Design a protein with these regions (language model features):
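Signal-transmission linkers at sensory-effector interfaces
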Residues: 1-31
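Juxtadomain coupling helices with adjacent low-complexity linkers
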Residues: 2-4, 133, 138-188
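Helix-loop-beta substructure at the N-terminus of cytosolic sensory domains
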Residues: 26-61, 207-234
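Regulatory sensory and allosteric helical modules in signal-transduction proteins
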Residues: 50, 54-60, 70-109, 117, ...
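Signal-transducing coiled-coil/dimerization helices and immediately adjacent hinge/linker segments
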Residues: 169-244, 254-255
Length: 255
């Protein structure tokens, strides 16, 4: 019997959009999820752990621990969804548990070129019930069964990872909304429809240096002035616009 690839989830288009909204694939934030791989490995004693998100085309490892390298790595490894056991994990809210991969209905027909002995996969489900990806654990040297307590513990761990993704996605959306609102206010108050000028104005708000060319533009528009120490600072008009935009320093640092 040949291995049967997983069908796409019924909500695949919306699910993939939810993954894209996280902005985590190919980002510099993947290392934030190393701890989940390390804890899962410590709890289970399994030799490999993969923290994966599935976009519309393939699966991407945000973090991974491989047997040949005992440290967590962030290589943004990409693999096909088609033909993978991991894709089956997206189809259920419960973990796929195959302590002996030669006996489980899904895994027993897989080609298993890497010689996996035991496999467990936990879906990463966001607050909107989209399966963004999964965390899987594997052994290669021997079959290793786990107690229900350990399964439950890992499941709670993965739920915490999903919650972290939710929080990060919400913050990302909130920052985007605030920036759009700030840009609208800046355009209305200054009649300057130039994103680069806006960015340099934010730099001044954040006590950062700008080029002489943009100093001149900001001064000409009565947004900035030169203080007694020859430093560029906001005028009264500039400060009013900054207050109207309501951007905090942490958000301005992201621009």
């Amino acid at each position: 019997m040949n291995f049967v690839s997983a069908q796409l989830p019924d909500n695949e288009e919306r699910r993939a959009e939810a993954v894209e909204r996280t902005g985590l694939i190919d980002s510099n934030q993947a290392s934030l999820f190393n701890i989940y791989c390390e804890l899962a490995k410590d709890i289970t004693g399994y030799e490999a752990v993969l923290f994966q998100l599935f976009d519309s085309k393939e699966r991407c490892y945000l973090a991974e621990i491989q047997p040949e390298n005992n440290e967590t790595q962030n290589l943004n490894t990409r693999r096909p969804k088609e033909g993978s056991v991991c894709a089956h994990v997206l189809l259920d809210t419960k973990p796929l548990i195959a302590f002996d991969v030669t006996k489980h209905e899904i895994t027993k027909t897989h080609s298993n070129e890497k010689g996996v002995k035991s496999y467990i996969g936990f879906p990463i489900i966001d607050k909107n019930n989209y399966a963004l990806g999964m965390v899987c654990m594997m052994t290669f040297s021997k079959i290793k069964e786990l107690s229900q307590d350990k399964i439950d513990l890992v499941e709670k761990l993965i739920k915490k990872a999903a919650h972290q993704i939710d929080v990060m996605s919400d913050q990302k959306q909130l920052t985007s909304d605030r920036l759009i609102n700030a840009l609208d206010i800046f355009n209305q108050e200054t009649n300057i429809n130039d994103m680069i000028v806006f960015k340099n104005f934010i730099h001044v708000c954040n006590k950062m240096d700008v080029s002489k060319d943009f100093e001149k533009i900001l001064i000409e528009n009565n947004l900035c002035t030169i203080d007694s120490k020859s430093k560029l600072e906001l005028t009264y008009k500039g400060k009013k616009i900054q207050d109207s935009m309501g951007l905090h320093t942490k958000i301005m640092n992201n621009i």
